[in-house]
Amino acid sequence: MSLTNLFKLQSSLKPSGDQPQAIQKLVNNFKQGLKEQILLGATGTGKTFTIANIIQHLQQKTLVIAHNKTLAGQLYNELKAMFPNNRVEYFISYYDYYQPEAYVASSDTYIEKDSKINDEIDQLRHSAAGSLINRDDVIVVASVSCIYGVGDLKDYQKSTLHLQIGDKYERKNLINKLIELKYQRNEINFQRGTFRVRGDIIEIIASSSKEIGIRIIFFGNEIENIQNFYVLNGKAIANLKLITLFPASLYATNNQKLQESIKRIRQELKEQINHFEKTNQLLAAQKIKMRTLHDLEMLEQIGNCNGVENYSRHLALKGKGEAPSTLIDFFGNDFLTIVDESHVTIPQIKGMYFGDFSRKNNLVNFGFRLPSALDNRPLKFNEFQEKMNKVIYLSATPGDYELTKKIPIVEQIIRPTFVLDPEIEVRPTNNQMDDLYFEIKHQTKNNQRILITTLTINMSEDLTTYLKNLGIKVAYLHSEIKSLQRLEILKDLRLGKYDCLVGVNLLREGLDLPEVALVAILDADKQGFLRNERSLIQTIGRAARNITGKAIMYADCISPAMQIAIEETYRRRKIQKQYNETMKVTPTALNKTILETISIKQKERIKNEKGKSKVQKKLQINTNMTAKNKEIKRLQKTMKEAAKALDFEKAATLRDLILDLEKKEKR
C-alpha cells in the first residue's frame, strides 16, 4: 500500500453544499502549520463526510473522540462504510457494569471493586491496539475511555510475537511464550485469549478475534505450517507464511521488567508502612501490608493479581505523577484528532481526572492502596493537550473552551440536500399530551418518525407507557440500556419498528436519523443544563435532515435560552434560503443507507431467536414481566445513580440486595 495513498474514501457521494469550501479551508490551514480549528457545522450538513474527505487529504492516522457510546457506535458504522479497505476500529469502555473500589470513612465501609466485562467490546479494544501497531491506515472511533491508562506501548510492542514457516522454535518454548503473553492454556473451554495443544499442533484464539483461530503445525523443532481456521468447526481457511500475535492483555510485560516492578512495589510498601507508623495509624499500616504482600505473592507466582492496574506506574517503570500510557500513545506523534460534539466532549475530558482522584485518595489515606495507585488514572487535561497534534473541534454549538482559543472557525451551514433548518413552533403546556398525540398520529400517517425529549426519567417512563396504551409504537431510550443495544433501537426506529423515541439526554448530539420529521421538547422554558441554548439548538437539529422537519417547544413563556436557539435557527434558515434561491436549487429528501450495527453476535442472536418455539417466547415474555424482575431493574437503576453520585456505600448495599434477588429467581 502506497504511503501517499493509504486512506481511500469510497462513496457514491461528492462533496456539495458547504462541504467543498469547508474541506478546502480546513486542509489548507493544516498545511500552513495551524494545529487547531473549529468546524461549526449545522446539523445534517454532512460533517462526518467532510471529516472523511479531510482524512483522505491528510493521509494520517485519525482518532475520533465522541462523548458517549451511542455516538461512537454511529460514527464507527459510518466511517467503516466510507473506508472499507482501511482499518476502522472501535474503542470504548468494556464494562457492562462497574462498581469502583471505594472507602466511605463516615461509616468505615470498604467496598470492593465489582465489574462485568463485555467480552465483545474487549475484543474490539484489542483489535484497535493491534491495528495501530501493525498498520498506518487506521481510524479509531473512541469514547473518553481513550484517555484512561492501558498497558505501556513499548512493552506491548516488545511482547508482540512474530512467527513464520521455517522458524526454529521448540514447542515447549512457544507454550511458555504464550503464557508470558497472558494467554491461558485451556483444552476444554477454547475461547478468545486461550490456546490448546494437540500433539505437534498448537491452536490459538487471539485476543482480537473470536471466530477465527491460528493453527501452528510443528515438525520436530521447526514450524512446518501456519493456518487460520474456523473455531466453530476447525476447518482450515488458508495457509499463511507468517503471523503477528499480540498479547492477550493490554498490560503485558516481560519477566525482567516484572521483577524490577516488584522491587519498586516492595520499596514503596516499606515507605508507606513507615509513614503510617510515624503518624500512629497502625491499623492502616497493617491493612496496606496485608493487601500489598498478598498482591506481590500473586505477581511473583502468576504475573497477575486482582487490581493489577493499581500498580501500573511500577509495571511501566514510570516516575511519580508521570502521565499514564493510554491508547493515544499508540498513534505516534503525527496524527489527526477529531473531537466530536466538542462542546460536551471537552468538559467531559476535563472532569475525568478529578472524580477519579477524590475516590482513590480516600483509599490511599486509609491504607487500602499504595500512593502509586493515584497514577492509575485518566489523563489530566493539560496532558491530553500535550499529546494532541492536529485537532478539529466539531460541533454545531462550539463550547466556551473552543471559542476562547481564537482559532479559525470554518462554518458549514448549507446542507448537501439543501434542506432548511426546522421550523419552530412554541405551544402552551395546557393539553400538551393531547396535542402531542395528534401530532404523532399526523406524522406516522406520512411514515415519519418522532423524537420526544423530557426533563426527567420518571416523566419519560410515564410518557412512554401513556403512548403505548394509545397504540403508538414507542421506545424509551435511556442511559441504562447497553451501548450496542442503543444502536439497535436507533436502527429499529429508522426501519419502522418504532415510530417514536422518548428520552431525556440521549436525543441531542449527533444522532443521524433522516426519517425524523418532528422533535417535541417538553418543558422547553425550564432553566438548566438540559434546556440551555446549546442543548435546545442540538435537540432542534434532530429534525434538520428531513424536508418537512419541525420542532415544537411546549412552554408557557419564552426563556432567554429559547430566544437564542430560535434566533440562531432562523439565522441559518435565512442563509440556507438565500443560497437555494441564488443557486436555483430545491431541497431533496435524504435516502441514507441503514447500516448494520457493530454487534458481532447479532446473527447468532437472530438465529437463536428463530429457533425458539412460540411457547418459549411467550414464557420468556411472561417471565420478563414479573414483579421481581421489575424490582431488580428498579434497584439496578438506583444503584447506578448512587455510584454516579459517589455514594458507594448505598450502591454496595443495593448491589448485594440485587444479587440476593437474582439468586432467589434462579431457585
UniProtKB/Swiss-Prot annotation:
- Family assignment? Belongs to the UvrB family.
Where is the motif (Beta-hairpin)?
Answer: 94-117
* Cross-referenced NCBIfam families: PRK05298.1, uvrb
Q: Which Gene3D superfamilies match?
A: P-loop containing nucleotide triphosphate hydrolases, UVR domain
Any idea where this protein resides? Cytoplasm
Q: What's a GO cellular component annotated to this UniProt protein?
A: excinuclease repair complex
Sequence ranges assigned to domain Helicase C-terminal in this UniProt record: 432-594
Q: Which cysteines are joined by disulfide bonds?
A: none
> Which parts of the sequence bind ATP?
G41, A42, T43, G44, T45, G46, K47, T48
The UniProt gene name for this protein comes to uvrB
**Occurrences of domain Helicase ATP-binding (ranges):** 28-185
Q: What does this protein do?
A: The UvrABC repair system catalyzes the recognition and processing of DNA lesions. A damage recognition complex composed of 2 UvrA and 2 UvrB subunits scans DNA for abnormalities. Upon binding of the UvrA(2)B(2) complex to a putative damaged site, the DNA wraps around one UvrB monomer. DNA wrap is dependent on ATP binding by UvrB and probably causes local melting of the DNA helix, facilitating insertion of UvrB beta-hairpin between the DNA strands. Then UvrB probes one DNA strand for the presence of a lesion.
> Which intervals hold domain UVR?
629-664
Q: Name one GO biological process term.
A: SOS response
Subunit notes for this chain? Forms a heterotetramer with UvrA during the search for lesions. Interacts with UvrC in an incision complex.
Domain note for this entry?
A: The beta-hairpin motif is involved in DNA binding.
- What protein name is recorded for this chain? UvrABC system protein B
Q: Which UniProt keywords apply?
A: ATP-binding, Cytoplasm, DNA damage, DNA excision, DNA repair, Excision nuclease, Helicase, Hydrolase, Nucleotide-binding, SOS response
Q: Where is the signal peptide?
A: none
One GO MF term on file is:
ATP hydrolysis activity
